[in-house]
Amino acid sequence: MNKQASQPRAIYYVVALQIWEYFSFYGMRALLILYLTNQLKYDDNHAYELFSAYCSLVYVTPILGGYLADKVLGNRMAVMLGAFLMAIGHLVLGASEIAPTFLYLSLAIIVCGYGLFKSNISCLLGELYQPEDPRRDGGFSLLYAAGNIGSIVAPIACGYVQEEYSWAMGFALAAIGMLAGLVIFLCGNRHFTHTTGVNKAVLCARSYLLPNWGWLLILLVAAPLLITVLFWKEWSVYALIVATAISLVVLAKIYRQAQTAKQRKELGLIVTLTLFSMLFWAFAQQGGSSISLYIDRFVNRDILGYSVPTAMFQSVNAFAVMLCGVVLAWLVKESVSGNRTVRIWGKFALGLGLMSAGFCILTLSARWSAAYGHSSMPLMVLGLAVMGFAELFIDPVAMSQITRIDIPGVTGVLTGIYMLLSGAIANYLAGVIADQTSQSAFDASGAVNYAINAYVDVFEQITWGALACVGVVLLIWLYQSFKFKSRALAVES
């Protein structure tokens, strides 16, 4: 084996932890909306609000998690602490089947754990390489592929266990997965001795009457309690408003920092891409909420007498991303060798167009359900797969553009703003959209009178909304192409 080309041993422990983190997170996420409506008997409106609040806040806490890792904990300790908190959160969530009061606390613990983990796992991987190490890109590709494996397997495994045993066992499996990843990671501790550890000097220094380790303990207790209150009082939207306002102030500061017209143009492009990405993900995140309940209520899931658990359908999207990503990488390689390139706006138009096509298929499925009572499973799988393929033309394109910006020291900040808007705000908007399908008519026996027309209307509106975005993006693409050709002709003349 060529030692120059082989990856450092530590990466395999990071990859194992990433697989199990994705397994834990996406296994629980596949069950959550179904658990709220089918087990805890929340009405759709309440379930959508809580689900979107949870999915929004997991994109806000990594900002604080990254800060704590940089200043005090170091990436390795932050990742381990985050993994432990997520495992505890999933176990407490399982207990909420018996004691529903634990629900908000469990979600808050998971959000805090995710904040410590998500922002620092990539940074930990980066510490394994020198800045110019040619193996770096391969290591990050391996980490991304590993995550997809976890997100494919998780809904299948957790969905099966929940269906065959109980909701608590389904959530417990997610917790066991996270603990398994943590144990594997700890077994490779000797390979991480060169990475940044806990900053003991800062940790032991005193600030405002207490040593910093005391403030850290207070934060670890207070943060879950504060987020619990946000869930309980439905105040998470205020946290998003504050975070967004701060981001806009920071964005304005970056704009003033730009010294050339080229830099301002690049920043304007990133902002525009971020806004379209936010809309894209507001549509795409229906997969965990309104689409999941639609599948549960109106799709025929029987195969040879076996009823496929609804949660398993969450694997379709992840599988499509992984499979189509390999195909797309080959096609792009071929197009580059033939001197053919795809413009940024062309890719965004294609991604939004595929999202529109996916929801068009779901609209057909919903109309089929309206006519015949239930829709076919293959049609549903096709729609989800097309939506998964669409993702490949959005985030990678936007993130690539962010890393190219020529303003020193702003890449990390812009990435955080992008994740806030396309993650947190998009998930909040997704909840607003999903709420249009809410089913609130309970009869005396407690059964719900599900109205298929609500799903038909929402899926159709998203189809046209995504198509309208395609139209706007194509206009931008045509304008940019015209400007480029005009400039080229002017140079030739």
From Swiss-Prot:
Name the UniProt record assigns to this protein: Dipeptide permease D
Protein's GO biological process: protein transport
Membrane-spanning segments: 14-34, 49-69, 91-111, 138-158, 167-187, 212-232, 235-255, 267-287, 312-332, 344-364, 379-399, 413-433, 458-478
Organism superkingdom: Bacteria
Location in the cell: Cell inner membrane
Protein topology in the membrane: Multi-pass membrane protein
GO MF: dipeptide transmembrane transporter activity; peptide:proton symporter activity
Major subcellular location class: membrane
GO cellular component: plasma membrane
Disulphide bridges, residue numbers: none
Organism: Salmonella choleraesuis (strain SC-B67)
Family that this chain belongs to: Belongs to the major facilitator superfamily. Proton-dependent oligopeptide transporter (POT/PTR) (TC 2.A.17) family. DtpD subfamily.
Keywords: Cell inner membrane, Cell membrane, Membrane, Peptide transport, Protein transport, Transmembrane, Transmembrane helix, Transport
Function per UniProt: Probable proton-dependent permease that transports dipeptides.
Pfam family, one: PTR2
